[in-house]
Each structure stands twice: as C-alpha cells, then as structure tokens.
UniProtKB/Swiss-Prot annotation:
UniProt similarity note: Belongs to the short-chain dehydrogenases/reductases (SDR) family.
PROSITE patterns reported in the protein's UniProt record: ADH_SHORT
Modified residues (N6-succinyllysine): K93, K217, K228, K235
GO cellular component term of the entry, any: peroxisome
Site (Responsible for the stereoselective reduction of 3-ketosteroids into 3alpha-hydroxysteroids and benzil into S-benzoin): F177, L180
InterPro entries, per database record: NAD(P)-bd_dom_sf (IPR036291), Sc_DH/Rdtase_CS (IPR020904), SDR_fam (IPR002347)
Name of the protein: Dehydrogenase/reductase SDR family member 4
Domain notes: The C-terminus peroxisomal targeting signal tripeptide is important for peroxisomal import. Once in the peroxisome, it is involved in intersubunit interactions. Three specific residues, Phe-177, Leu-180 and Asn-196 are conserved between non-primate mammals whereas the respective residues are serine, phenylalanine and threonine in primates. The two residues at positions 177 and 180 are molecular determinants responsible for the stereoselective reduction of 3-ketosteroids and benzil. The presence of an asparagine at position 196 is important for the maintenance of the quaternary structure resulting in stability at cold temperature and improved catalytic activity toward retinal.
Residues found modified as N6-acetyllysine: K93, K106, K217
Name of the top EC class for this enzyme: oxidoreductase
Catalytic activity from the UniProt record: a secondary alcohol + NADP(+) = a ketone + NADPH + H(+); 3alpha-hydroxy-5beta-pregnan-20-one + NADP(+) = 5beta-pregnan-3,20-dione + NADPH + H(+); 5beta-dihydrotestosterone + NADPH + H(+) = 5beta-androstane-3alpha,17beta-diol + NADP(+); all-trans-retinol + NADP(+) = all-trans-retinal + NADPH + H(+)
Length: 279
C-alpha cells in the first residue's frame, strides 16, 4: 500500500511539473550560455528566431547586409534585456562570413549554434525567362553561401564538443510556389544539403536540421499575399486558415538547437499550416 502511495505521489509530482511548465509558471533556459549566429536576422523569420534563441538563454549575434538594420534589431532586442550583438554580413562574401565568426569569437569565445536564414529571390515569372545571371545569384546566396557558412563554423563547434545547425529552407522545396522557379529549386537543394551535412557532421557531434516554413507573413513574402484576393485564396487552400507568423517558426528552431532535440538529425520540420510537403 505504501509502495502504491509513493508511486502515485511520484506521478502526481511529475504531472504537476508538466502542468507548470506548459502554463508558463516555470521557465528554464534550454540554450543557457550557448552562442548562436543567425544570418539575415534583423527582420521577419530571422529576427523572430534571434529573439527566441536569446529569450531561451543564448548569446545571439544577428546580421544583415545593412548597418541601419543591424543597429535597429540590436537596439530592440537589447532593450528587452536580451544578450544580443550584431554585425553587417553579406553571406555571399567570404570576408563578411569571416567577420561574423570573428565577432562571435571575440565576444563569446566560441560558437554553438548556426541558423542559416539568408536567401534572395530576384525573379518572379516563367522559368523559361530566367537568365543565367539570376540562376547564379539565387544558387550562390541560397545554397552555396549556406554551405560555406556551415563549413566555416564547424571547426569552432568542434572546439566546443559539438553544436547545432538549422538551415531555413521553405515548403517551396516540396511544393512549388507559382512564378518562383529558381527560388523553389534552391530550397529543394537545401533539403539535400541538410541530409548530406547531417551525415558527415554527426560523428563530430554536430547536428544539422532544416526548417521549412510555409507562407509566413513577412516583407520578403509580401508579393504572394499583398493583394487581399490572393491572400484569401491562399487561406482557403490551407488546412489552418491563416498565414503563418514569424513567431510560429522561432520555437521550433530553439527546440532543434536544444538538448531536447539531441537525437534529431538530418530532418526537415515543416511549419506550413498543413501545406502539402512531400517530394
């Protein structure tokens, strides 16, 4: 009888802990003292991810191509009491990638997390009208720069005993967005990049996963939803009848970077409101 009572008491205590955690009565910092680099992180999805990682205890280095955007993002997040610094970084330039890493090392003596979010989409139209210049730009920034950024941070993660990389892809890698051919192709390539890096880096205790957002309401995606009729049509085609918010992506990334996801590697998590997501 006493044994049953102790068992029941243990279950009750565990259940109360779950209840308190889910209701926000307790909050741990799953990324406490981790150092995170987030590219293209002064607006939209990248900014929401940077904020969430910092809220969960990480020291975050944000970046953007424009100094004014970096200054604004850093001021906002530091104003919220978060550990955030920033630097200008054009991910397509090797010298800028090096400066981003150097900044993190000087301030925090290491790197544990990379979120590769930078992407471009300079074309809207028929695939047959895409120039070689456009193809080169899209693949260079969206795919090659992502690979080079990962290559650059891996030695620093090894020094820390491991790390976590999250590549921000898109549901467009699975299901084409009309008139965005080169962008769609680049995001499909990131699915393969994730799988290959995940397999190669796992022995180094570095996990690589991918986030595939659906249609998230940001400035970057505005061409797809700025007309109300188009937005309404998109909503009708979705299982969850709304467009996503940047914050819908942020918690998933924080989870993937945490020890709670220590046995997750090479996976793509779709945050798309039920958008079809299979190749």
């Amino acid at each position: 009888m006493q044994k049953a009572g102790r068992l029941l008491g243990g279950w009750t205590q565990a259940w109360m802990s779950v209840r308190m955690a889910s209701s926000g009565l307790t909050r741990r910092n799953p990324l406490s003292n981790k150092v995170a680099l987030v590219t293209a992180s002064t607006d939209g999805i990248g900014f929401a991810i940077a904020r969430r990682l910092a809220e969960d205890g990480a020291h975050v280095v944000v970046s953007s191509r424009k100094q004014q955007n970096v200054d604004r993002a850093v001021a906002t997040l530091q104003g919220e009491g978060l550990s955030v610094t920033g630097i200008v970084c054009h991910v397509g330039k090797a010298e800028d990638r090096e400066k981003l890493i150097t900044t993190a090392l000087k301030r925090h003596q290491g790197i544990d997390i990379l979120v590769s979010n930078a992407a471009v989409n300079p074309f809207f139209g028929n695939l047959m009208d895409v120039t070689e210049e456009v193809w080169d730009k899209v693949l260079s920034i969206n795919v090659t720069a992502t690979a080079m950024m990962i290559k650059a941070v891996v030695p620093e993660m090894e020094k820390r005993g491991g790390g976590s990389v999250v590549i921000v892809g898109s549901v467009a890698g699975f299901t084409r967005f009309p008139s965005l051919g080169p962008y769609n192709v680049s995001k499909t390539a990131l699915l393969g990049l994730t799988k290959n890096f995940a397999a190669e880096l796992a022995p180094k205790n570095i996990r690589v996963n991918c986030l595939a957002p659906g249609l998230i309401k940001t400035r970057f995606s505005s061409v797809l939803w700025e007309e109300k009729a188009r937005e309404d049509f998109i909503k009708e085609a979705m299982q969850i009848r709304r467009l996503g918010k940047p914050e819908d992506c942020a918690g998933i990334v924080s989870f993937l970077c945490s020890e709670d996801a220590s046995y997750i590697n090479g996976e793509t998590v779709v945050v798309g409101g039920g958008t079809p997501s299979r190749l």
